[in-house]
């Protein structure tokens, strides 16, 4: 089974729950147009596998991921430099998103430290869009182009 995009979310402002959309436009050298992280060079896009959300009883966007995929549970463990193609867009993995207590606060967790520990190794991959930009849509296939 191929991995596929199952949810897309835009963070239009910090501190506000992201808005679900069916299509986004990825911008070379950064992230997703209309997202508050678009100009970041190393932490522009968070890609997360649905299995993490399901294991923790969370909904799409709760971990502030822009792209939720299904079928690649190892996405959090992809080495920096790994290249992904989502639809026609290419992204470079810059590393794992380190769990913090802030995400627990955003999700009203009663024990933010326990929530942080539960996310260890499952928080997703932080990425940057490389030279190939364009649209990403719910349903797009996700492939690993180059493993680092």
Language model segments and positions:
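Metal-cofactor-dependent catalytic cores
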Residues: 1-148
């Amino acid at each position: 089974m191929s991995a596929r995009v199952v949810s897309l979310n835009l963070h239009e402002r910090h501190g506000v729950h992201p808005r679900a959309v069916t299509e986004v436009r990825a911008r070379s050298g950064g992230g997703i147009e209309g997202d508050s992280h678009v100009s970041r060079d190393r932490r522009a896009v968070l890609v997360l596998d649905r299995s993490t959300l399901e294991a923790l009883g969370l909904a799409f966007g709760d971990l502030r991921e822009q792209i939720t995929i299904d079928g690649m549970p190892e996405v959090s463990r992809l080495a920096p430099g790994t290249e992904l193609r989502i639809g026609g867009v290419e992204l470079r993995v810059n590393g794992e998103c380190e769990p913090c207590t802030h995400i627990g606060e955003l999700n009203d967790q009663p024990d933010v430290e326990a929530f942080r520990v539960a996310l260890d190794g499952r928080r997703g991959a932080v990425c940057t869009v490389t030279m190939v930009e364009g649209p990403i849509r719910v349903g797009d296939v996700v492939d690993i182009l180059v493993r680092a």
